[in-house]
Amino acid sequence: MRILCVAALCCASVFGQTPSSGVSSEWDVREMLASLQARARQLGPILDQLKPADWVRNGAPAEYTTQWTTAKHELGYLQTSADTLARAPEKLAAALDTLFRMQALNSTLGSVIDGTRKYQNPAIADLLQAIAGENDHNRDRLQQYVIDLAAEKEHELQVMDAEAQRCRSSISNQRPQGKK
């Protein structure tokens, strides 16, 4: 029974630690995600206006069709990932997934913008680029949030490890009580 009490005290001290002040609040994260999603939603209708099959018929590489399809899928994945992160902003995996989805979309979108500029309409390409550029600030904020969240999680693990070591030491130093 005594060992259980010591273990409970150790766990309570670990979970009673205050979070690092470097990580954005949940409200700030949700606000940033709402802005990110609003900008991303603007891309969908513009991507729908693109006709990469026509580009290919006019001599463009067939890869543009694949990249356009990939960009549309990545846009959907980004929305889903951002929704998941908004529901659980403390989840490092969700934050990383959202950041990686955003980077993948930006990478693919760059090629689609180039194709749009060359084979369809430079004004549409400029519009896509402007909307994607408006999300650069959100991408930077998300990246900083991921870094801060990872540092916080690493600190929490260090505290838990130190407390576990202290508890093990405390338990191993106790003398066994004889039976009465």
Regions found by a protein language model. Give the residues of each.
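Sec-dependent N-terminal signal peptides
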Residues: 3-13
